[in-house]
Amino acid sequence: MWYPLAAMKGVLEALHQGDYDTAIDLLTRKALFGREREAKEAWLLLAEVYALYGEEGLEKAHHALEEAYALGGLEYDPLYRSLLAELLALEGRPEREVLPLFLPSRDPRVRYHQAQALFYLGRLEEALEALEAGLPPHLAWRAEGLKGRILERLGRHGEAALAYERGAELALGLERYWLLLDAAAMWLEAGEGERALLALKEAEAAVGEEDPEDAATRHYLLARAHLLLGNPGLALEEIRKALALEEESGHKAYGTPLVEGQALLQLGRYEEAMASFREALARADAGERPHVLHEMGVAAMDQGAYPEAEEHLRALVREEGYPYLAQAYADLAEALYRQGRYQEAEAAAREAVARGAVAAGELVLGHVAYDLLHLEEALEHYRKAAESAEEGSREWVGAQEMVVDTLAQLGYRFPEEMVRRGQAVLPYLHPADEWHAALTAYVERAQALLREGKRLN
């Protein structure tokens, strides 16, 4: 553990309280007028403080490090070298310039700055391993925040939420508030709506009067939590508070009207939802537009507005950088299939399969073949869709239904398979679903054939 000079304790307290102006003023005086040891420590701590500002603090952080180095004895000092490594990594310098600065150390403060450097270099697992307990308070909560960001990037959303919450326990005031908002966002990504609501309740209690932009974010997250929990009415109330606060702050995010549209869709208000999506599209930048277009395409398809869905999805598949382009092609294939445009649907579905959306693409290919009475081909596609889909997913349920149905159309071929697949999918269907009755009848007929010892071809 790092034990600061007694003279630095007041500085560390100011830093923990978030009073950076006071801390910087005290450190500057110690750096300029203190004895050599105290001045050197002050310059290093000043560099650390300026590094907390990210790119904005780079110039002043470098200056502080240069002043510390000029006092001598720091060429092989692990703390000095880890701070320099962090600054160079933040500037975008290559690994070959950054990593040689690392010296072995168990000092948590040194390890923290090495972790920051590794994070900036994109070496996320190594950054996670570098962090150690025992940091001074102004870094302890930041270390948990850094863990949260690393875990978030690694897609480990539940763990990221826990890290942000641990950071919030150590932080004060606005820093605590922001970490709780981060935790709530990660709980939402993890599908934990109730835990998101708890974090947001704590966040509200952590500050007095909220900045309008921060308050808009909190209401946006509340809306998403209520949507996740199946409360679209409450979600709509919260998202409209967020929209009003965005008007006040002047910061208009595309995600706010997007969530409004999602809430309206769940309430069955399609036209209003599409108006919200159009507002989201108007606010979106180039990287955000595809997400809105996909939302609009799927919403139109669910409404049965297939030409409109096609329009949005065709615009979407022109967005080559979109990470869900394979699913976009599968959705376009479905929109074309629903319009009876089989050749175009087949081409889009094959593109979806080639790009990785195997289950969704094969399902559409099966539908096209089935409608054209190419039942053997349809069966092959449906089996592939069922094998590649996640159990319980929309594609898996649809594929299992259609394998059983197609086998029935083929004269109850492979009754054992019909029974196995039918019994697997029935628990996922509501008894009122027409497919529940149809599959039950198919399964009972196949079981009867098996009892009779028949294998019809």
How would you name each of these model-derived features?
Residues 23, 61, 97-98, 127, ...:
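Single-residue signature of alpha-solenoid repeat helices
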Residues 9, 45, 83, 113, ...:
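"A position-specific structural signal for the A-helix of alpha-solenoid helical repeats
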Residues 6-29, 33, 51-52, 109, ...:
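Alpha-helical segment of the N-proximal tetratricopeptide repeat
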Residues 27, 65, 99-102, 131, ...:
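Hydrophobic/aromatic packing residues within the alpha-helices of TPR/SEL1-like helical repeat arrays
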Residues 5, 41, 76-79, 109, ...:
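Start-of-helix register in tetratricopeptide repeats
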Residues 18, 54-56, 92, 122, ...:
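Residue-level detector of the short coil/turn that links helix A to helix B
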